[in-house]
């Protein structure tokens, strides 16, 4: 006698899009109008209990020589998340991404990512006394982790393009001698490929220097770790 197996119903991408589109949560980034459209981010608990973030966009596009008529920016962010994940750069886990035109032929687009459990903005970590609590050895390891993630990104010719300190998140796992710092990069909407790794590195690191509060000593440590991971010196980072 054959064994009958109950198959899970197949859900189309269009049905998943509609499901995520109708879900509502807490606004963590209120909808704002730019790029000729609207974009905002909500946080909510999915049906499986997972904390997720949904970026919801209407008519929010960018143009390039490949896409002269406009393309939803979440598709560029999806490409970056997938590309950086493949390079072992710590970024949010992609759950779903989709874009479709509505009846008026305007773009609707979604990007759904899993929350980075336990991660906080690095400046909030500093403000809460994380450096003092865990000590300088762990802080050096944090800088080393940040440098490694950035170097792997740039060696793949990816440029973050909006590398402000508020987009660097940190988590410490364990206590005492067993404590370990982990770093993640967020807000990849403007991330793009460059012709050379050096061009990507120079742009992002100069931008991070301008938009961070690292002391001169900490910055020099970060640059040292970065150049060791990148494999060569980058001029003009002092």
List each language-model region with its residue ranges.
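Conserved kinase catalytic-core helix
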Residues: 83, 87-90, 119-161, 165-166
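Alpha-helix N-cap and loop-to-helix initiation/capping positions
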Residues: 69-72, 138, 200
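Active-site acidic catalytic loop and adjacent metal/ATP-binding pocket
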Residues: 40-46, 52-54, 148-193
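Soluble, non-transmembrane catalytic domains of enzymes that act on hydrophobic metabolites at membranes
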Residues: 1-12, 17-19, 26-27, 137, ...
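Short glycine/proline- and charge-enriched loop/turn segments
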Residues: 59-64, 128-133, 200-206
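C-lobe/activation-segment region of protein kinase-like
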Residues: 177-238
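A short, local hydrophobic-aromatic micro-motif
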Residues: 92-95, 166, 206
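Conserved ATP-binding subdomain of kinase catalytic cores across diverse folds
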Residues: 18-122, 151, 155
């Amino acid at each position: 006698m054959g064994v009958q197996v109950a198959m899970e119903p197949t859900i189309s991408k269009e049905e998943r899009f509609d499901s995520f589109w109708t879900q509502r949560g807490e606004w963590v980034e209120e909808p704002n109008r730019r790029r000729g459209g609207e974009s905002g981010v909500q946080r909510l608990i999915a049906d499986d209990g997972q904390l997720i973030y949904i970026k919801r966009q209407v008519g929010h596009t960018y143009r390039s020589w490949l896409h002269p008529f406009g393309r939803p920016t979440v598709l560029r962010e999806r490409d970056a998340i997938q590309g950086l994940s493949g390079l072992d750069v710590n970024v949010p886990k992609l759950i779903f991404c989709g874009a479709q035109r509505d009846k008026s032929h305007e773009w609707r687009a979604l990007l759904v990512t899993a929350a980075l459990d336990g991660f906080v903005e690095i400046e909030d970590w500093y403000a809460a006394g994380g450096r003092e609590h865990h000590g300088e050895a762990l802080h050096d390891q944090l800088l080393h982790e940040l440098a490694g993630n950035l170097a792997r990104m740039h060696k793949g010719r990816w440029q973050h393009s909006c590398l402000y300190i508020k987009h660097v998140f940190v988590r410490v796992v364990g206590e005492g001698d067993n404590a370990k710092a982990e770093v993640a990069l967020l807000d990849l909407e403007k991330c793009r490929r460059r012709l050379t790794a050096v061009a990507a590195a120079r742009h992002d690191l100069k931008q991070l220097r301008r938009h961070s509060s690292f002391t001169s000593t900490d910055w020099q440590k970060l640059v040292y770790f970065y150049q060791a991971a990148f494999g060569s010196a980058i001029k003009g980072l002092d």
